[in-house]
Design a protein with these regions (language model features):
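Acidic, low-complexity, intrinsically disordered interaction modules
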Residues: 42-104
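Intrinsically disordered, low-complexity segments enriched in Ser/Pro/Gly/Ala and basic residues
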Residues: 4, 29, 44, 65, ...
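Charge-rich, solvent-exposed alpha-helical interaction surfaces
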Residues: 11, 15, 28, 32, ...
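Intrinsically disordered, low-complexity regions
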Residues: 3, 106-107, 113-121
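Negatively charged, low-complexity tracts enriched in Asp/Glu with abundant Ser/Thr
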Residues: 2-36, 121
Length: 123
């Protein structure tokens, strides 16, 4: 039959994840990073680092070292989520359940896009 076995699917997903690169993650998040003035990705001598700026204190308040593309993806997903929460609520209230669901879909879509790009590069 033409159906892919669960084992083959798991192996394929694992291979696609292994092909995830920092460049793919940065490409997928480029539009977001261009819009968010508070977070930057900096290439240090040790590797990529995601830095968050606190505009009220006028200082960097978060620094996440990302030794792997998966770490970079996780850090940027968190930064994106915080950015969107502020965009949606203005920082004045909690997200509604509907807004939380929408944000979860956006996160899933960004993750899926990274996986799709990684799969393209590995084939």
């Amino acid at each position: 039959s033409n159906l892919i076995s669960e084992r083959d699917l798991t192996a394929w997903k694992g291979a696609a994840e292994r092909m995830l690169t920092n460049e793919i993650v940065l490409k997928v998040f480029s539009d977001y990073l261009a819009r968010d003035d508070d977070f930057e990705v900096v290439l240090t001598s040790k590797g990529y680092t995601v830095m968050g700026f606190d505009c009220y204190r006028q200082d960097w308040n978060t620094v996440y070292f990302c030794p792997t593309p998966e770490d970079l993806l996780d850090s940027l997903l968190d930064a994106y989520e915080n950015f969107r929460m502020m965009e949606i609520t203005g920082g004045d209230r909690d997200l509604t359940e509907k807004e939380e669901a929408k944000l979860a879909k956006e996160r899933d879509a960004l993750t899926a896009l990274c996986e799709k790009e990684a799969a393209k590069c590995s084939s």
